[in-house]
Amino acid sequence: MSLLGTINPNINPERTVAGRGTQEEEGEIARVEHNHHNNAASVSTDETVLERSKEIGDEDVAVEEVTRLARQLTRQSTRFSTSGNVENPFLETKEDSTLNPLSPNFKAKNWMKNLLALSSRDPERYPKRVAGVAFKNLSVHGYGSPTDYQKDVFNSVLEVGTLVRRIMGTGKQKIQILRDFDGLVKSGEMLVVLGRPGSGCSTFLKTISGEMNGIYMDEKSYLNYQGISSKQMRKQFRGEAIYTAETDVHFPQLTVGDTLKFAALARAPRNRLPGVSREQYAVHMRDVVMAMLGLTHTMNTRVGNDFVRGVSGGERKRVSIAEATLSGSPLQCWDNSTRGLDSANALEFCKTLNLMTKYAGATVAVAIYQASQSAYDVFDKVTVLYEGRQIYFGRTDEAKEFFTNMGFECPERQTTADFLTSLTSPAERVVKPGFEGKVPQTPDEFVRAWKSSEAYAKLMREIEEYDREFPIGGESLNQFIESRRAMQAKNQRVKSPYTISVWQQIELCMIRGFQRLKGDSSLTMSQLIGNFIMALVIGSVFYNLPDDTSSFYARGALLFFAVLLNAFSSALEILTLYAQRPIVEKQARYAMYHPFAEAIASMLCDMPYKITNAIIFNLTLYFMTNLRREPGAFFVFLLFSFVTTLTMSMLFRTMAASSRTLSQALVPAAILILGLVIYTGFTIPTRNMLGWSRWMNYIDPIAYGFESLMVNEFHNRQFLCPDSAFVPSSGAYDSQPLAYRVCSTVGSVSGSRYVQGDDYLNQSFQYYKSHQWRNLGIMFGFMFFFMFTYLTATEYISESKSKGEVLLFRRGHAQPTGSHDVEKSPEVSSAAKTDEASSKEATGAIQRQEAIFQWKDVCYDIKIKGEPRRILDHVDGWVKPGTCTALMGVSGAGKTTLLDVLATRVTMGVVSGEMLVDGRPRDQSFQRKTGYVQQQDLHLHTTTVREALRFSALLRQPAHVPRQEKIDYVEEVIKLLGMESYADAVVGVPGEGLNVEQRKRLTIGVELAAKPQLLLFLDEPTSGLDSQTSWSILDLIDTLTKHGQAILCTIHQPSAMLFQRFDRLLFLAKGGKTVYFGEIGEKSSTLASYFERNGAPKLPPDANPAEWMLEVIGAAPGSHSDIDWPAVWRDSPERRAVHEHLDELKRTLSQKPIDPSKADPGSYDEFAAPFTIQLWECLLRVFSQYWRTPVYIYSKTALCVLTALYIGFSFFNAQNSAQGLQNQMFSIFMLMTIFGNLVQQIMPNFCTQRSLYEVRERPSKTYSWKAFMAANIIVELPWNTLMAFLIFVCWYYPIGLYRNAEPTDSVHERGALMFLLIWSFLLFTSTFAHMMIAGIELAETGGNLANLLFSLCLIFCGVLAPPQSLPGFWIFMYRVSPFTYLVSAMLSTGVSGTNAVCEPVEFLHFDPPSNMTCKDYMADYISTRGGYLENPSATSDCTFCTISSTDTFLSAVSSHYSDAWRNFGIMWAYIIFNIFAAVFIYWLARVPKGKRTKGST
């Protein structure tokens, strides 16, 4: 029987049972035991315990008590099985039963005990599966680049040498992460792993759980999983030791219930209780785990993520915990899984783990960065890590004593976990008087002290004893294999780590696939509707094609477009596969299913959509356009279209699965798509393909589909040739017999009114009917080959992993020190190591604040679903220079909202009340004169720390301050914040670059650099940080307040020691009501006396006042209060005193004259810097961002150059024949297709800049939105100019377009014009991208919309359907499309003014009337229509070419060289329109238009 490990009736009686429960739990166990064993032995044992309790502490008695009871429980388990009150909770529970997880009476402990009793009846059916772990000399290393600098466009070129060395196997530096760890965690024990971020906690947990991606164990390392070797555990038993990362990755569209039911089904054992089906088992287990973690109410709520609305962040974290719990692994490693949970829920999590270890025999290791004393006490063992070294491993209750005996002191009210972690920080550890110089200082000294201790010797003896008891490969391994075998499906391989069979895995993933579709059908429906609309548009463009030869080109173009739309309808699968990849990889690590099983399921789940789409799209298109109206022909068309879709889907999936990052996949995908399009056989017929590139046509699956569709359309049909299409025609020629005339279409025969479809295909395309079904077989071959490569790649290629928080520096600015920790470089891990003297010296330069900020009766109302809701309710307070006020409250009390209201950052709703600065209302400069440190550390990832600070200083300090003075001030801020060691380090993205503490310091620094004249707001500055980092941030706040800074700071459940560091407290209850505002007092005496005076219980001496306060007002989980504390405050003398003081401040301060010497001429301006400075600084920053994002620039360059070269050489030296001119037109048409890829590259960059601007820089009035938009549009200009030059050279010359200008001697002029046209195309693309994304949130949405409009512009530009063939309804689109003018100008510039020469297949053959030469016969026709004769003097078989000049071809497609410069001007009109539209849309959609306020502000 499996729960959260194994419900184990045979717990090894020799080992100590882990976990100390509450007294109530122990009492209940004792009562259960007493009922079953009311005998002398138990009585005597009880007496022994009572006697011993006098000698030793209660805590140890509790341990022994639980140990004894559990042993008795084990020995007497058979008695459980005979007791009559045991029931099967999967089948028989009553609604109000304590075993029913859906009942409010549910008790997890009772449920576990009951299940233990049931499983003990048949130990052979439910063999135990436990896995403790012992490790000796555990050392782990990774590999890094010896010189990891920030890459930019220039120095990336230098990386080629590094790449070569890497391929050769050299140039990598070994980085030691963990050194010589020893420890033993027995089954049923809990280990807490303590250490600062970067000390190796994550690496340690990953190592013992076997997740070794990118890290390697040293050869001397030894691991013993209770008789199982580490290699065997990783391969055969993957999923039995799991690692749960602190990130939460789930399918956002699924409900919580479906997510967890999937996990339960994937690990559902075969040896379930009799009569329990897999479905019943999974549903019940899901319900139990949800009840244990308080998730039952979210059963039908979507999980969600940052973009999809779902459960809250804390609930999502608990979903991750529940999913890992349901995997049923006997060894579980949890990495900072309490992050995002408040202390009460964190404690509940630890208690749940304790239940698992106690009853299920699970082994648990947890890394916690902020552990309360209660949470710490739940654990049995603790290990302390210090910069990759282990400085302690032992019992939790002995750890504190170990270090205090060494000479360290634990300050009053500091939790044991904080004390142990503080030892790893030189600035924070406290040495007892008399031990100075005797205690260890460095990590190595701590290690020596630990390894020479008696505690270490005892640990080594325990490990040796454990190894003797559980030798690797011994009996315990066989028991483990037996247990796994009992769980596994009957037809599952013995050595497989998976529980259910492959077919069950596929079935399970398919059910989930359909649930995902149901959960978010909007994307599927929008694609279906979009494709249907596209079919209607194309169908109307080619509406009701005539059944004659005039439709030959149109039919070819239509089938070409149809096969491409079918082929590329799956291109978006690359993006969707990347979105789900982290989830699939995580669940494969949990051994839920093979990645290829999910891949097969996703293919099958997509089939209904693909079939529906194929029918809707192809049916509409086929019958609107009058393609061959025969049942057989339609179904053949549908078949080949569908097979093309499937084949290309497999190709795109292979590309996504075989690349490690999305950017790796996109550029190759773009070039591949281009190649597939060019070599389909329409843009260049096979007879025109150059010999060296002909092979591309053979490996193009679409080409086979296109040939078969063309054969399906033309085979065995004859098409009438219209009179106007005969040569010669009109005038006297019309009276000539047919024998002397011929149809002008390829494949025609002199004297016939009809052209055979087969002849046209054979001569034009070299297509044959005999190839049709052969092609289907080839396409199936491609499909199965790509399916195989996709499934293989999915199974074996994993996503690229984060490099960890290793600092990167700009080349030439600082030599990176050799870090020995992949997680973070410890040399710069803490500002605690900086010179404190320089920090104190720097405070002298910090802006002194003198203004007092006050607010009175502040209310904030918004409408939610049409109903008014009050978020803040008559809040009063003030902040004075040199003080730090804490703003606290329960979750949802409106703490951040109050900060936003006070800082004038709310953009909706109604604000009322009085907010004054020195007794006067706030003006529009208030926002930039205050600093606001947000909870999220948002920074531009390419900038350095110093640059980020300078940007803030230059734009936010008053304009009259000299530039150099601002820059000097930044250096003072760097010193004050202790950031000298990483001032030139690159910020990076979270997880790579600066660590959490350094980011938080930078966020504070950015606000300080602005020299806030009024006050500093801080929103949750310690959220998500470990206790030591929180302490150092509070140190920094102390330093600022001592220098006269006024600070208002929200804080979430601080420790007792952190809480004591604030001067005043503003405490809010639900609904934004004030509970208390005033002094905190020495040891919280003032605060405590207020609450005690009004009916609260006394504050215990060792309690945390912050937690006590929440319990007093009934806001902590499980607490309740009958007192209405907001009402108590409203009627209190303290509130009256606050109001009196506020009135006095207003009266005295408003009368104080403003010092004219301090008056700043621009003091009341909205922005400190003038617009020109704003634009210049923004431009510099965006330029540097582009320069330092070589992936973007090189992707753009690769896309442009490779596309241009590919097209250029595919159409190399194009001839001026009828087909050759058409090919040159398609070479221009194909160049337009890079539009979509360029847009997809531009938009994410813009979104990065915009999110930073809107969240942090706009509210603080750093610079205006006009400067932001202008800078982002201008920055593309130089890069587009460079790209235009590269495209021009790589495309224009290989095709040979310059030769067409030689007859008119205009090579230079036309070359320059062609360059300008390409340049205008790239400028149009970038400005169009900005116009599309300006008002839209997501780059993906903007990209899809831009591509839709681009497709319409391309359809109507006159290439696929000439304007004269368009229905009248669509002529306006032809005129509106910018590509109409661009393609026309480029085509006429490229080919006008030269002679045209037919290919042999294009010549028409006919006889002249008797007694006439060909020249005599054709003279009148040639003079009016053009063309030339190959054999003018012949009297039979005239060989005639219909065009003699390229201008004839141009006029047929409505293009004239005389319009080229005009069209270039029109393109500029479009570009300017795009710019103004982008600015207008941004203003309309995203610029706040002000808010409604009442009262004085």
UniProtKB/Swiss-Prot annotation:
Q: What membrane topology is given?
A: Multi-pass membrane protein
- State where ATP binds: 889-896
**Record-annotated membrane-spanning stretches:** 523-543, 557-577, 599-621, 632-652, 665-685, 777-797, 1192-1212, 1226-1246, 1273-1293, 1313-1333, 1352-1372, 1464-1484
Q: What residues are glycosylation sites in this protein?
A: 137, 336, 762, 1411
Protein's cellular compartments: Cell membrane
| Observed effect of gene inactivation | Leads to decreased azole resistance, including itraconazole, posaconazole and voriconazole.
Task: Please give the name of this protein.
Answer: ABC multidrug transporter C
What is the native source organism of this protein?
Aspergillus fumigatus (strain ATCC MYA-4609 / CBS 101355 / FGSC A1100 / Af293)
Print the organism lineage: Eukaryota, Fungi, Dikarya, Ascomycota, Pezizomycotina
- Gene field: abcC
